Amino acid sequence: MILRLLQGVIIKRLFKGKAVLITGPRQCGKTTLVKSIVENTGKQTLWLNGDDADTQSLLQSPTSTRLKALIGKNVIMVIDEAQRIENIGIVIKLVVDNIKTVQVIATGSSSFELANKINEPLTGRKFEYHLFPLSFNEMAAHISVLEEKRLLEHRMIYGYYPEVVTNAGDEENLLRLGN
């Protein structure tokens, strides 16, 4: 796996009494980053997917009692694609304010959508990060500076999205499929 520069920054912010929000374009590696962070902590985690209708229904009318029952003994609560959940800001606020031993990590593809749903309820209760596609520095640390310099023109043509970078030789096909 390619180590993301944000990983260490986010790990240092965990369990500080605030939610961690990660936004960024689709397919830039948000879910993979969160999986790596959670794995690094070794702590019990509840993973919820905002795309899932059951998850949306489960969080529709949140109360601190229901959330405590849902979270159980988990100490990390991940909400992937959080912007898809109605009143997600209230859900996160209830956890941050009432279940202080639980770290909330939420991801969203659309920073505008997610920001509109969480900013007011989470004022002062969140650390926000924006994840971009892979960077030159991340790739240089992964393969080597010399190799990454050699590949720079290729990267400028096809980009630094993780799927393109990790599927060398299939870039044209991936770009065609993405349209």
Please provide the spans of the model-predicted regions.
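Conserved lysine of the Walker
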Residues: 30
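Short glycine-rich substrate-engagement loop in P-loop NTPases that contacts/grips substrate
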Residues: 46-76
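Pre-Walker A adenine-sensing motif
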Residues: 1-14
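Hydrophobic positions on the alpha1 helix immediately C-terminal to the Walker A/P-loop
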Residues: 33, 37
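Short regulatory helix/loop adjacent to the ATP-binding pocket of P-loop NTPases
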Residues: 112-127, 143
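Hydrophobic anchor at the beta1->P-loop junction of P-loop NTPases
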Residues: 22
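Interdomain hinge/linker elements that couple catalytic modules in large macromolecular machines
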Residues: 132-179
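Conserved catalytic/switch belt of AAA+ P-loop NTPases
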Residues: 89-112, 119-121
